[in-house]
């Protein structure tokens, strides 16, 4: 290895090291802060403390922690499951089926990505209010069931699915849904894993829409509960960081369970 190559590799490793520290430090600081009192967090203490149990006791006494946690998990799992089914069917159909109008429809779907969700909140709220969907899982789920990004990801990956296999399956008498569920889905585990992690994370962290339609304390989610901990006068940062730490647990579990396919799915979706 030449001197220039060694210097280049050294610089690359230094850059990767700095990037890793910058990425990991906020997570580590959050864990440390969850074990300390608020005054220690404000003072910049960077060592583990012994106040996690006290923070937990204060949290459960002031907020409906576990009902909010289970609400978030329930809504998020429902959104993820239905979004994967709807978006994968749409992406598959846009790529596999031949129709003169499909490209125009697909263009409209992609153009909708340019509309910020904030601009749609008021009309959606009025519509859901008249339909009686406020404070309900259905009302929380519907705006996330068919996102343009997921449809685009599934369509891009459907390009790699051999059309000859589909034609052969049709000749053998397999239905269209049979082709999709028995052939397409098993061969596209990577993109489903990537889409699942993306959808799960977005749904779990969905604060704005949840705040808009979930006015009942029995239906509030973790982001809403965390916002209740932030006060204009006194904020217990140790308790706040513990709540944030608990919120990250479901996403971490899903990511590590699907990490085998996650990177492959992300790289495949941008071919």
Regions found by a protein language model. Give the residues of each.
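A structural signal for multi-pass alpha-helical bundles of membrane permease subunits
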Residues: 2-271
